[in-house]
Amino acid sequence: MQTTVQSGESLLRDLPRQIVQRGAKAGAGDIVGGVEVEKRRMVRFSNNVVTVVQTWDITSPIIYLGFGTRSIASRLSDTSTAAVDESIQQMLPAVNALPETVESHIPRGPFQYKNVPGLFDSKVPRLEAELMDMVESAINASLAEGAKRVSGVLTSYHTRKSLYTSTGVDASTELTMVEVSLRSFAEDDASGQGVSVSTSLKDFDPEGAGRESGSFAKQSLHPGQGHEGKHNVVFGPSIFANLLNTVAFSASAYAIDAGYSFFADKLGQKVGSEQVTLVDDRLRPAGPGAIPFDDEGHPSQTNNLVAKGTFETVSHDSRTAAKLKTRSTGNATWFSDIGQIVPIPTCLVLDEGDRSREDLFEEAGDGLYITNNWYTRFQNYRTGDFSTIPRDAMFLIRNGKLGPPVKGLRVSDNMIHILQSTRAVSRGRKWMRWWEVDIPTYLGHVLVDRVGITRSTG
Amino acid sequence: MANTYMKPGDQTFDELIGDIRHGVYLKTFMEWNIDDKRFNERYVGHEAYLIENGELTSYVRNPVLELTTPKLYSSVDAVSKEMEFDAGTCGKGDPMQGAPVYEGGPSVRLRNIRLGGGA
């Protein structure tokens, strides 16, 4: 067997075509050949000093084979044609073992893709020592606000992606992103988080993230024990982005089909208050997560997932669309958690309101301000019952003003209730993405009435 | 901690529940989380049964165990000698890495624990 190893531009141009040729020879009717080339540079830091600097060069060929009523996809780390051949030979018996579903076909191209401005910044791939300077500026800004210890991670991404299909798609794109997430401590139980995410350097603000993180840490000194009950809660962008990620996943036809959605059977119904409009805007200029085409070559769209509280769009790829007799929404995405191409929103935007954060405190009257969280886990995916743990800065709201810091509480509620009880959304949005926010989300602060808050019983 | 479990005791499972007049057996759980100091933790039973006079009787829906770590471990008064394990993956990062873990251990009896749910 002859094997060819390629690199650089020829890899991006030729390998997808070679995958399609080999897939056709294997008898597949619909074939997608793709390749993603990513350079990732990461600087980790803890206790105010850089601890790890690492660079990854990740090249990932993607193979999709469709046989009408069955399909299979695979992502490789080897770019040789021999590896492609071997993978296809392994995929054939696997796809034949799958149960048949409704017949579906990948989108028929060619397509004219929209030019989405601001997704690539030529300065980002060249960042090297500057990344260390950015980390230093973030740490120093946090310390200047009163933090004693600062830790986190700053990462730059440069991704080139090309796609070729048996149905006439020939697409390529180049994307950049740079992000920092840091956590500052003023004492062991006084911490704050700061995040900055951008596709370009001009909107990237590590110093601002450091300031925010350090300021929250300082304000959180000497927290008291919070109380369980039903509280009006102002959610900061980080925690609410985490919750909206679960909303986006629930809007996926894959999640609905698999029984993992609290939106099942709710299309066209009110699932939230009038204040909630959540868009999957894959065409958003300079949007982290935006991209002109999906992993089947379908042009990306701007989809209203929830519009003024109504569940308006189920995210589809061609397979789920055929099953539900509708059209793809251009959301086919390789989902590494399950090793398949499934429909997933990738660029979330929450409509902004006209109030400031302080206006929301005033409207809340008495309640809580929660800035960050981790460990959102569902008790029941279908009903949306869940809990999540606030971490870092959390405060009482008293008489409409920011009050003293508190700790030891848990949000234990239901996602439909959260959406339906959303009373107000602030103006002044920012992009969020970090460990607990996988899908980049653009949002501000959000006031939700009577949120379930619990604490340990002993 | 890839392979951490509680040391087994000397009772069978039947002996463990045999002298419980009124209790709950949490066999598996669904929702769970823990704070970053590993102090406050919560588990919501998935497959769970009522224990009445030493017997498993009816199914219990979504019992919530929400307590501190010291309370959990100080409430243990018996541990079974049988152990069960499953293979699992623990997420580590950043960036995300899946660490293989071996998870399980013996059945554990806690006394005078409050089960609840909701706010």
Regions inferred by a protein language model and the residue ranges of each:
Chain B
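N-terminal small-residue-enriched
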Residues: 1-119
